[in-house]
């Protein structure tokens, strides 16, 4: 069975058992009345069952309802169908004030019907010939308004300075100021020029997201013809059907696939209604993607440390134990489905490097947008600065030093032999993004 953990907030006067049973029925075989066609099938075989209810600590009106769904209810290899069944209709149910899907346990038999990520972590490292450290990325800013040529120049400078990847922003598709084909051509030129100068393999996440699946595939095919290593997709706005289609193409044609989670906070930000990001992350691993943005723990975008580490494990590890402190309600066996690299991004800069290296480990992409392009001397020195800081942190960690306690000292020591790093440390020494969370609903 597929197991689901729902956070249920019943209407006043509705007992939790009734609310849990209603969720199970409405998201499987139930309807609002008895129908004569019920007699034509074996409902006992197909109906969802609420098998356990427990209170949420500290919340009088909320309960966790555990529901089991028979596997026969789901089409093989279709995340779209899985979500349509489990969360398609039940969230507007009048007996509930609010409902949140906290976690899913995907059984081994169902996992094996999915191809998963096009390549996975190890194959990506082999393709790029980069080992023993996190990968470095940068989103090109300003995200909208640059011409294709000026955009390509920014890409070249960042890659030449020492980054592994640069990135289209999620909303860069094919706008009047920069059509997709021009951007792809100038970015490919930047990649090849930077590779020739540095001797390293470089990439730029070319955003293939489009208004139709046909246009999306046309862009992916053009990227492959240019010989670039990676394309990108906005998987929530683009949809799971489009994402799985693109992932299959990428595996068959040797392209890596970077996934952006634009729109996720619409679904996952409220604490008592919607769907937790760990469910969206599991779904992405099944649908297919080699990288996905996972929050930063530090920086400007929200991400609580333990919870973030919980879905970083879900993305990368093969077997994940149930750990309630990390919000993981079920053990999950991925049966060797390839892993996904978590991408840390959002308001991070050089002083965050020790914390990011410690928290995310080697199998991650650290993405500094403003933290690269905001360098007072320009893009290439910004990239140099990030690469120097990363190498210093990785070396210190490998020597057994404590990055949590000695992080600032490690960065300061590296400043002595990197003027680019020293200049940036001076600029960003005081910047913090510390706001109280407003969404306490």
Curated annotation (Swiss-Prot):
EC id: 4.1.1.39
A GO molecular-function annotation: magnesium ion binding
Annotated keywords: Calvin cycle, Carbon dioxide fixation, Chloroplast, Disulfide bond, Lyase, Magnesium, Metal-binding, Monooxygenase, Oxidoreductase, Photorespiration, Photosynthesis, Plastid
GO cellular component: chloroplast
InterPro entries: RuBisCO, RuBisCo_large_chain_AS, RuBisCO_lsu_C, RuBisCO_lsu_C_sf, RuBisCO_lsu_fd_N, RuBisCO_lsu_N_sf, RuBisCO_lsuI
Pfam families per the UniProt record, alphabetical: RuBisCO_large, RuBisCO_large_N
Chain positions recorded as Mg(2+) binding sites: 167, 169-170
Post-translational modification (record): The disulfide bond which can form in the large chain dimeric partners within the hexadecamer appears to be associated with oxidative stress and protein turnover.
Cofactor-binding details, from the entry: Binds 1 Mg(2+) ion per subunit.
Top-level class of the enzyme under EC nomenclature: lyase
GO biological process, one term: reductive pentose-phosphate cycle
Catalytic reactions on record: 2 (2R)-3-phosphoglycerate + 2 H(+) = D-ribulose 1,5-bisphosphate + CO2 + H2O; D-ribulose 1,5-bisphosphate + O2 = 2-phosphoglycolate + (2R)-3-phosphoglycerate + 2 H(+)
Cofactor(s) demanded: Mg(2+)
Modified residues (N6-carboxylysine): 167
Keyword Aminoacyl-tRNA synthetase tagged: no
Other notes: The basic functional RuBisCO is composed of a large chain homodimer in a 'head-to-tail' conformation. In form I RuBisCO this homodimer is arranged in a barrel-like tetramer with the small subunits forming a tetrameric 'cap' on each end of the 'barrel'.
Protein purpose: RuBisCO catalyzes two reactions: the carboxylation of D-ribulose 1,5-bisphosphate, the primary event in carbon dioxide fixation, as well as the oxidative fragmentation of the pentose substrate in the photorespiration process. Both reactions occur simultaneously and in competition at the same active site.
Family to which this protein belongs: Belongs to the RuBisCO large chain family. Type I subfamily.
Quaternary structure annotation from Swiss-Prot or TrEMBL: Heterohexadecamer of 8 large chains and 8 small chains; disulfide-linked. The disulfide link is formed within the large subunit homodimers.
Identification of the protein by name: Ribulose bisphosphate carboxylase large chain
Source species: Symphoricarpos albus
Lineage, uppermost ranks: Eukaryota, Viridiplantae, Streptophyta, Embryophyta, Tracheophyta
């Amino acid at each position: 069975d597929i197991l689901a953990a729902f956070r249920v907030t019943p209407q006043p006067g509705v007992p939790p058992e009734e609310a849990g049973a209603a969720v199970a029925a409405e998201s499987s075989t139930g309807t609002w009345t008895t129908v004569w066609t019920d007699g034509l099938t074996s409902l006992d075989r197909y109906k969802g069952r609420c098998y356990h209810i427990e209170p949420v600590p500290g919340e009088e009106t909320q309960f966790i309802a555990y529901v089991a769904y028979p596997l026969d209810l789901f089409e093989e290899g279709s995340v779209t169908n899985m979500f349509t069944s489990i969360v398609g209709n039940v969230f507007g149910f009048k007996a509930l004030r609010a409902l949140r899907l906290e976690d899913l346990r995907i059984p081994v038999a169902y996992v094996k019907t999915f191809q998963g990520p096009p390549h996975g972590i190890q194959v990506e490292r082999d393709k790029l010939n980069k080992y023993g450290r996190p990968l470095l990325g940068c989103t090109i800013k300003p995200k909208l308004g640059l011409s294709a040529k000026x955009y390509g120049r920014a890409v070249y400078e960042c890659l030449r300075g020492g980054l592994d990847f640069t990135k289209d922003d999620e909303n860069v598709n094919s706008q009047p100021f920069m059509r997709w084909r021009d951007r792809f051509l100038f970015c490919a030129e930047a990649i090849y020029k930077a590779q020739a100068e540095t001797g390293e393999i470089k990439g730029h996440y070319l955003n293939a997201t489009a208004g139709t699946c046909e246009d999306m595939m046309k862009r992916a095919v053009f990227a492959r013809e240019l010989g670039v290593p990676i394309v990108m997709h906005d998987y929530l706005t683009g949809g799971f059907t489009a994402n799985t289609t693109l992932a299959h193409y990428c595996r068959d044609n040797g392209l890596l696939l970077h996934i952006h989670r634009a729109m996720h906070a619409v679904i996952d930000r409220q604490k008592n209604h919607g769907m937790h990001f760990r469910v969206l992350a599991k779904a992405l691993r099944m649908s297919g993607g080699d990288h996905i943005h996972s929050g930063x723990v530090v920086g400007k975008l929200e991400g609580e440390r333990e919870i973030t580490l919980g879905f970083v494990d879900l993305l990368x590890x093969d077997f994940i134990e149930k750990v309630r402190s990390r919000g993981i309600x079920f053990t999950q066996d991925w049966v060797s489905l390839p892993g996904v690299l978590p991408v840390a991004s959002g308001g991070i800069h050089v002083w965050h490097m020790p914390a990011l290296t410690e928290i995310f480990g080697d199998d991650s992409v650290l993405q500094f947008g403003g933290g690269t392009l905001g360098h007072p001397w320009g893009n290439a020195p910004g990239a140099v600065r990030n690469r120097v800081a990363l190498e210093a942190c990785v070396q210190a960690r490998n020597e057994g030093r404590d990055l949590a306690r000695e992080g600032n000292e490690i960065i300061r020591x590296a400043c002595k032999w990197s003027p680019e790093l020293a200049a940036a440390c001076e600029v960003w020494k005081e910047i913090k993004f510390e706001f109280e969370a407003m969404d306490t609903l």
